[in-house]
Amino acid sequence: MKMQLPMKNKGEEKRQSDFFDICRKCKTDYSCCFGTRPPISRERRKIIEEYLKREKLPIANAFVQEEYVFPKENTQGYCVFHDMKTRKCIIHSVKPETCVSGPITFDTNRTTGKIELYIKMEKICPLAGIVYKDKEILQKHLNSARKEITRIVDGLDAHALKAILKKDEPETFKIK
């Protein structure tokens, strides 16, 4: 059975394309594609593997299984899907949920168990500054990020989610 991603509308595709262009031009020392190890659900892994095969992208053993599954890194520590020349994601249309939701990230409230959303600080992510300053873009992106983050949280087992939530992200602040 062929796995399919939820349909995105043209406005969503345009917004993601604009974000992609901003990220590609990013010159900060921090890189979302360097050493971040985004979690991959079983469903997303199948989708990415199908995409790699369909597009004839020669990446063998694209994933690592430790406490959770994430994309393999190249010898420089970048995500194997990050094209070092173009600074683009070669699987942009099917990239991991947390990559789609960026610069929004998440944690869970230890008391309520509910997902809480955070945004990266502009000093490490120019896109975060653009998104946060434009309330309309922020709201649209929050809606998209909530869906993606809910999808990844629902798609991970408890052990994997616990491992991900241990990762410290000090350069963020909570969005109400």
Model-derived regions: residue spans:
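Short loop/turn segments that flank or connect secondary-structure elements
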Residues: 1-176
